[in-house]
Amino acid sequence: MLRPVHCVVPFKSSGCKTRLSSALSGEQRWQLAVAMLRDVLRTLRSIGMVTVLARPGMREDIIADLDATLRFSELELGDALNGFIDENTAAGWPADILIVMADLPLIREEDVLEMIRTPGGVVLAPGRGGGTNMILIRDSRFRTRYKGLSFAKHKREAEELGIEAGYCYSYRAGCDIDEPGDLIEILLHTNGESRALLERFGLRILESDGRGRLDQTQSNE
């Protein structure tokens, strides 16, 4: 029988996705960040409890229809997440903690279930470039190290604590949206709010030399 899972999604509500600035305006990047968050929450709502960790000032109505709790924290990402783990530990560990990044609009329920079914005191799903896109924590000793090449740091954290680590290698879970070229993946592989938004912005895929490239002829939205 699968243990209860509490999903935690950290969300940066200001100055988000600056590496997309060559393709999207500041307002468009904000709208996309919200759309991706909502796509992630829609995937997670069938898994268990869901909490969004955000800085104070984020509007609660953005996620009000998605059965998620909004929790504010002034702390940096790693400290906010580790504080959440501390509280879960103090409460007797009522549920395992699944940390999911908010820029994974490609993930589906089966990707999350694969994480939950993978054995280990901690289960890591790497992102491209050395990041960690999802972490399932079953052992209350584990704490996150979300800076720089976090995947290697999380592996080392588990090793140093003597925690058995499991790994979940998924294309969709590994596809975080950071660069303009990543937007193609949304248009190709999703049918959620993120794709609808990019199409409304006028973005589309053109074929060039047998490969897809992003047409940045955009609307003024």
Swiss-Prot record:
The record's Gene Ontology biological-process terms are: F420-0 metabolic process
Q: Is Transport one of the keywords? A: no
Mind telling me which InterPro entries this protein's record contains? CofC, Nucleotide-diphossugar_trans
**Coiled-coil ranges from the UniProt annotation:** none
Its UniProt pathway annotation is: Cofactor biosynthesis; coenzyme F420 biosynthesis
Gene3D superfamilies noted in UniProt: 6.10.140.50, Spore Coat Polysaccharide Biosynthesis Protein SpsA, Chain A
Sorted alphabetically, which keywords does the UniProt record give?
Answer: GTP-binding, Nucleotide-binding, Nucleotidyltransferase, Transferase
> What's its catalytic activity?
(2S)-2-phospholactate + GTP + H(+) = (2S)-lactyl-2-diphospho-5'-guanosine + diphosphate
One annotated GO molecular function is: phospholactate guanylyltransferase activity
EC supergroup of this enzyme: transferase
PANTHER family, per database record: 2-PHOSPHO-L-LACTATE GUANYLYLTRANSFERASE
**Which function does this protein serve?**
Guanylyltransferase that catalyzes the activation of (2S)-2-phospholactate (2-PL) as (2S)-lactyl-2-diphospho-5'-guanosine, via the condensation of 2-PL with GTP. It is involved in the biosynthesis of coenzyme F420, a hydride carrier cofactor.
Family statement drawn from the similarity comment of this UniProt entry = Belongs to the CofC family.
Describe the protein's quaternary organization and the partners it interacts with: Homodimer.
Protein name per its UniProtKB record? 2-phospho-L-lactate guanylyltransferase
